[in-house]
Amino acid sequence: MAPNETVFRRDLPLAGVYGCVQTHGLVPLLIRLVTRSPFDHVFISTGGGQIIEAEPGGVRIRDIAEYAGCRIEYNTGEPMTDIQRAAVAEYASSKRGEPYAWAADAVDGLRCLGLRWRILARFERARRSVMCSELAAQAGQYAGLDWNCGQDDPCQVTPAMLARRPGMQPGT
């Protein structure tokens, strides 16, 4: 098996675990280049092979098998209680249908390039949409976990930041 190849089992990952994934395409490649990370997307497992994620089109539930062949790392090495895992999955599921935050992706890109204007923070807080890493950070907050990666607000968290947290392990 190649080092970046992921084997999928329907019983993994556990509910409440987030996964950082390296997807295919031009936009994901640009995200990885700007954030200097091998990962460009984040999802949350709801168990039974199902995940919830913020993507173009909004927050939706999908099957983990859609990422077969993609490199994935999960935060399975992070200590969490069953109650915290359930809370993460519950929160993420409650956001189903919420719009995707295209503008937030642009703001994150500007930040990664070194632009940190105050107006960017005001813009982020005023929106009513969510991006993938923000959804994970918010779900962590809801469960009493600090997944903000040192940022003041979940809307400032990127997939790269979540992937660099302790406890990340290759998907199995």
Positions of predicted regions on the chain:
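N-terminal capping segments
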Residues: 2-40, 47, 52-56, 60, ...
